[in-house]
């Protein structure tokens, strides 16, 4: 697998870009998670960044990537509506793993947004998408630009939802390479990794949460629910960061 030309790939239509990466992805599927990170660091351009929502299994990708690339910038888009337990988890992991945390927020405060738009998350799919654009997508785009990122690591897994079921290890998104080292991991593999390295799930895991985002759009799991139904009232799975 050779070094890939980001500018050339960005110039291609999406379908052609996927086809251009197909052979590389076939090889990456054969590597383990650590091998994928190492390959990316050797073959893809820097600067390198890692994004995290500090959700249920966040400790896995944070530990995995940071141990191979210490001091990699870790991007958090903070909406201002995270659970108290999430903010505590962020502090705990930042200290334990010595993370180079970079926090990005919307230009407007949460209170100002509510005054201007009302509670967007109560305004159906259109409102949720506007909320996500303001609080997740724009801050992430700004982070990638300010950090001059060309390669972006993230901890998505195919098992998490239908929208992630066919994601490849390597793609181009928002003009940069995107690498998903643990994309093919199942819940058992996640658990084993956490146990092996003395890491914890998010504190709300023990209270019945399978996925954690903002307080107003996250539900506990109940029998019969798919994991993706615990977010955004079942109307959406993605917050916008991993779409497009």
UniProtKB/Swiss-Prot annotation:
UniProt GO molecular function: phosphoadenylyl-sulfate reductase (thioredoxin) activity
Keywords for the protein's UniProt record, in alphabetical order: Cytoplasm, Oxidoreductase
GO biological process: hydrogen sulfide biosynthetic process; sulfate assimilation, phosphoadenylyl sulfate reduction by phosphoadenylyl-sulfate reductase (thioredoxin)
UniProt superkingdom: Bacteria
Active site: 239
Reaction(s) catalysed (UniProt annotation): [thioredoxin]-disulfide + sulfite + adenosine 3',5'-bisphosphate + 2 H(+) = [thioredoxin]-dithiol + 3'-phosphoadenylyl sulfate
Protein name from the UniProt record: Phosphoadenosine 5'-phosphosulfate reductase
Native species: Klebsiella pneumoniae subsp. pneumoniae (strain ATCC 700721 / MGH 78578)
């Amino acid at each position: 697998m050779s070094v890939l030309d980001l500018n050339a790939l960005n110039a291609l239509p999406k379908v052609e870009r996927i086809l251009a990466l197909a052979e590389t992805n076939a090889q990456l599927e054969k590597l383990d998670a650590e091998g994928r990170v190492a390959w990316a660091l050797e073959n893809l351009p820097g600067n390198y960044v890692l994004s995290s929502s500090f959700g249920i299994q966040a400790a896995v990708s944070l530990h995995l990537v940071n141990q191979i690339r210490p001091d990699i910038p870790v991007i958090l888009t903070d909406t201002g509506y995270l659970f108290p337990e999430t903010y505590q988890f962020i502090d705990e992991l930042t200290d334990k793993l010595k993370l180079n945390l970079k926090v990005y927020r919307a230009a407007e405060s949460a209170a100002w947004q509510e005054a201007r738009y009302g509670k967007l998350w109560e305004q159906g799919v259109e409102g949720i998408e506007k909320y996500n654009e303001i609080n997740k997508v724009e801050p992430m785009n700004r982070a990638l630009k300010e950090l001059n990122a060309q390669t972006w690591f993230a901890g998505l897994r195919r098992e998490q939802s239908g929208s992630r079921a066919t994601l490849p290890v390597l793609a181009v998104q928002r003009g940069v390479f995107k690498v998903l080292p643990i994309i093919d991991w199942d819940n058992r593999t996640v658990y084993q990794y956490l146990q092996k390295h003395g890491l914890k799930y998010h504190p709300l895991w023990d209270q019945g949460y399978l996925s954690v985002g903002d307080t107003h759009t996250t539900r506990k799991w109940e029998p019969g629910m798919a994991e993706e139904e615990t977010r955004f009232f079942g109307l959406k799975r993605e917050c916008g960061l991993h779409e497009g």
